[in-house]
Amino acid sequence: HPDYPAYGDRQHPMRNNIAYKDKPYNFDNYLDYMHGQVRELCTNYGKLDMMWFDFSYDDLTGEAWRASELVRMVRSLQPDIIIDNRLETSGEGFGSLVTDQPSDFCGDFVSPEQIIPQTGFKDSRGRNICWEACITMNDNWGYCAKDKNFKPAEMIIKKLVECVSKNGNMLLNVGPDARGNIPAESVEILEKIGAWMQKNSDSIYGCGGCDLPKPENGRITRNGKTLYYHIMENSIGGIPLQGISLDEVESIRLISDGTEIKPLKNWIVENYPDVVFVQVSNTVKLPDDIDT
């Protein structure tokens, strides 16, 4: 847009072009245009689930975008929409959503980029704050023919589980080429993730974390009264299901095929009465070596 600041801006293609240094512009003209484009999106395309503003930086943050006005307009047209936190921050920031005084445009979730936080996010009263880790498949958001540093499907699956176990979500980027084709490497990775999800999606969709300690060999996700122990490494002498007692267990099953697993009751574990142990395989190999 001709009224978007160019010279010296962090993002503009002409940011280093001296010819643009003294070019006059009226930023309000750009904001009128931008607000109009957002109004069009919220009006002409049915019910929208999410509005993802990306992103704020330097002096262009918060009310520099007329953010309160913008959010009021979006929510008036799409009352059920979810909005990210980047009208006041970027991928490295959390914004006022995590403070005692969230702004009118703080959004509905935190969006850490290219990192999974060590813990989830809570407000000052200890309530969970929604968040979403924004992750690329390789090292670029857009298509990059030379970038072959793709994360393996096994890693992405485990990181997805990690996000959910911390009450978060994962946004996974796919960068199509100029013709709209998804790279073969991405397709292979997505197919492997899809195959795992076909068997294990109940442990992801609708789930979050719990207050139990993280197992040494995996993660825990939860949906209501159901705990999903994600076993990523086998144990010797039985797999301990930390945090629960035997009298709390109604049943234990492999989510992939429904096989019932009986708690171990033998001499090996008899001196650990406060721990539930299970054996999910008759060999040292787990049924799913990525995440059982």
Region annotations inferred by a language model:
Residues 1-292:
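Mature catalytic domains of secreted/periplasmic carbohydrate-active enzymes
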